[in-house]
Amino acid sequence: MSEVVVGLDVHLKNTQVTVMKLNGEIIKRERVQASKKELKRCLESVPKGSGVALESAGFCWPWIDFLKELEFEPLLANPLKVKLRAEDVKNDKVDSRTLAHLTRMNWLPTCYVPPSELRWLRSLLRHRAFRTKLSTGVKNRTKSEFRKRDITLDADLKTLKGRRAAFNLDVFEVKQNVELLDLMDRQSKEIEAMLRRKYGDLKPVQLLMSIPGVGFTSALTLYAEICDIKRFSHPEKLAHYAGLVPKVRQSGEHSSMGRESKGDKWLKWIFIEAAWSHVRFCPEGHLAEVFSEVCNRKGNKKDAIKVVARKLVNVVWYVWTYEKEFVVK
């Protein structure tokens, strides 16, 4: 490690910088504008290869890439775990100073930094998921317009027949919604074609698609969110990362299961979606039996599908790790 470490508290308009020696002596503490030019000027005296810590945030990636360009070692701090180790008093100076302190002592809890290509893929898949949710909202609003006017359609809005029937009703709001749905469908097909063209031949994606209920988009989302299966030495660790392991509360001899641990919300979402699909596509399989058993015992489908999703984590881990296609038994 270099003789100097840096803590950055990055905001949209400004950045608090703390440069610190390994003995804890603060060399520089400065607030600069949130621009690459200003940050480069502020770090001119810092030796190349020094560790530069900053908290994970939605806008941190350009700064990570820029620090790499400047030949520093960017360290992405986990904000939740940093809070557990940081001081109770919290302001900008304490934040950047705390990050520098934790870095020099090798106590900084860090996050995985995916390659830029996978970050772009994650963003595109999340954009696609947002559009799917938006499309569902438009369909629901259109159905609401039908109920207001006591209109009944013989076909679903998902079909061309249903769209044409809705458009021909000559209701202004419904017409606009149908046009919007058509536009979103065309754009979604463009996204799908681009994803298949670019990532359709990836081996992990092909392997994951062998699992019933895991289609191309689900497999690609799992690939983008996990990035490298070697990060997880055991499926239990992947389950924790996905937030699919319930917390255990224990008092004396009594223990109870609480809510799941907080993990990657996108990974948790896609595992649950894939679990629903798997149960539908493979009703005679082991996981479908687990779903039925938990449903009968708890009477709650949501709890049951989470159990299936947790078991699906094991399947994904083994298929990807050992590069063997899933076989239905």
Task: Tell where the protein language model's regions lie, with residue ranges.
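Glycine-rich, often acidic, oxyanion-interacting loops/wings at catalytic, nucleic-acid
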Residues: 125-205
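Short alpha-helix plus adjacent loop in nuclease-associated cores
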Residues: 75-123, 160-164, 254-262
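Gly/Thr-rich phosphate-binding beta-strand-loop-beta motif of the actin/hexokinase/Hsp70
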Residues: 2-21, 99, 131
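Intrinsically disordered, low-complexity and often Lys/Arg-enriched segments
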Residues: 1-4, 25, 37, 328-329
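Conserved DEDDh/DEDDy metal-dependent 3′-5′ exonuclease domain
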Residues: 36, 41-84
